[in-house]
């Protein structure tokens, strides 16, 4: 983020099975992992919503519905508070290894896109994320190590804020959908 970036940033990501929310003010970060509804988590880290200067939202890849909920929440808050929004890939919210996110249907999201776990070249790599946990046996059989620290498997919204794109209108933040939603419109 540049020197002209806002001072108090609400950052959140809901794209994985382990969502997270943070209020970033200077070097101080207050964050929590998913334990309740998104707005409850936001209430946990933000004392006064009027102090939010900007919002950073995880854009995926991940659950189609969860990404839509996160973007709708960012939009509602941005409009109500009249603050700018930036997006960042959920994959940037992990540290300590290569992120692998559970894509359901026997697939994972990674830097390479969407694939079956056994198709990833993971030999000698340290993996993090809910996909790494779900497919631990597959990845370890392929020569990877799945991080033992549970904190490495949840997105860190502080990292998300560090990798955010330019701040602007929420309409300029695009979701990163790598496949169509599971739900289909009825005929």
Residue ranges and their predicted role:
Residues 42-54, 121-123:
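Phosphate/pyrophosphate-binding loops at sites that engage ATP/ADP/AMP, CoA/4′-phosphopantetheine
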Residues 47-50, 78-88:
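Phosphate-handling active-site elements
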Residues 9-11, 52-58, 66, 97-100:
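Short glycine-aspartate micro-motif
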Residues 36, 40-43, 71-75, 79, ...:
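N-terminal, well-ordered alpha-helical segments
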Residues 54-83:
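DPxDG-like acidic metal-binding loop motif
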Residues 1-26, 30, 36, 40, ...:
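Oxyanion-binding and handling regions
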Residues 31-35, 53, 67-70, 154:
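Alpha-helical context
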């Amino acid at each position: 983020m540049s020197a002209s970036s806002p001072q108090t940033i609400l950052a959140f990501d809901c794209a994985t099975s382990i969502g997270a929310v943070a209020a970033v003010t200077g070097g101080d970060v207050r964050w929590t992992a998913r334990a309740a509804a998104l707005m409850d988590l936001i209430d946990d880290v933000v004392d006064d919503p009027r102090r939010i200067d900007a919002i950073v939202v995880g854009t995926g890849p991940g659950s189609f519905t969860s990404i839509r909920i996160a973007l709708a929440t960012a939009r509602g808050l941005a409009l109500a508070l009249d603050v700018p929004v930036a997006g960042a890939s959920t994959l940037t919210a992990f540290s300590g290894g290569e992120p692998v996110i559970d894509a359901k249907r026997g697939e994972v999201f990674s830097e390479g896109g969407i694939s079956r776990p056994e198709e990833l070249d993971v030999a000698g790599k340290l993996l993090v994320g809910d996909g790494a946990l779900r497919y631990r046996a597959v990845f370890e059989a392929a020569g990877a190590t799945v991080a033992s620290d549970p904190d490495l498997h949840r997105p860190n919204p502080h990292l998300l804020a560090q990798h955010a794109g330019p701040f602007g209108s929420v309409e300029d933040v695009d979701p990163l959908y790598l496949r169509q939603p599971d739900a289909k419109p009825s005929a």
